[in-house]
Amino acid sequence: MITTKRLFLIPWHASDADELYELAKDLEIGPLCGWEPHKTLEDSKQVLAKVLSEKFCYAVKDMKTGHVIGSMSLKFEEIPDSKDSSKQLYQAEIGYWIGRPYWGQGLAPEGAQALTAYAFEEHGVDQVIIRYLERNKKSASVARKCGFTEMGIITDFNKYTGKEEQFGISVLTKADWERAQK
């Protein structure tokens, strides 16, 4: 479990399906994150079983109420070092969404900062990236608030929609993160 001042991030559980559905059926959330809104409780149960059950996928819960307010995840990979092709970088990618009733309270940056620290401190990554649909201005804002640098826009295949889409990429290196901690 990862904790912040107001949140705890814990692995998803099948018993979270009802709360997931209530948030994920919102027409404003899924499309901004690149996935279809959940149409039924069964959709949420399937997403829990097939997607959110993966390691490093977390239910974001309000510390006071224990209610699910969103989702965050980490994916780890090795990539070629753009400065030295003989080396590999170990990076983490953060994904997140927060339910609309909880927007505007700084909860996404709070959770993303905790995941960033976890990736650097516990997994020793060289950098953390946030990749978001270019039209999702709120996600770009979260990245900026967390100290990430916007690297640009790429066109990539969105596996959820089956279409090519524009994605913004923001990066925070370990060195920049360490400087910001002082």
Predicted regions and their residues:
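Acyl-donor (CoA/ACP) binding surface of acyl/acetyltransferases
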Residues: 1-28, 57, 61-182
